[in-house]
């Protein structure tokens, strides 16, 4: 707990104009990943007042990262740096920094983090560019769903649904099951809010297919519940009931598992949405 608090304190001091005090706090942070994060944080804080002045500090952060021997720790520090560079609009630098990660999945995670910052800033076109560099459905779909939501809110439901359908298209790369629930939630929520009803069947079907890649049966149940709730909210009650039945069968095949009760609770929420309870 202490290190994140020190990092936040250093950044707040620099943002308030006390650069000297902030750097004193940075030097209290141990060398390695925490020091790299502290330097990244104060760089971004300084960059919010003077973007050019942040560059030397970002370079110090990169030098600190280069000295981290453990690869996964180094990748996490790079991911943090990418987000901070993105926050202050140094997008070219952030993109290039992400590609210092030499493994595909951690690099995609860094780009997803970059995309989330851009989405929070309302820079949707810039965020959408990143989908071409993130080959994993569960990650890229989160960005594409946010952009689709933006399109729908700008009265382009057709464009929104087209992007949501594309978000669930196979990419030829392995599907990372741990990212699928968030992706399904983002895509289905966006489709319900702003998508064309005529696109529902295709998108819901793709979402149902995607649930099959999940590694445990109870995770599949929760994914099917997400689909069923979306179907029910669209008034596709018969489809929702079929999806609920499929989820119910899978759940009871695993009634001895630890997550069985939570799976039943999830199914009951879908039944409520479909008017069955």
Task: Describe each PLM feature range.
Residues 1-277:
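Non-catalytic tandem-repeat scaffold regions and their flanking low-complexity/translocation tails
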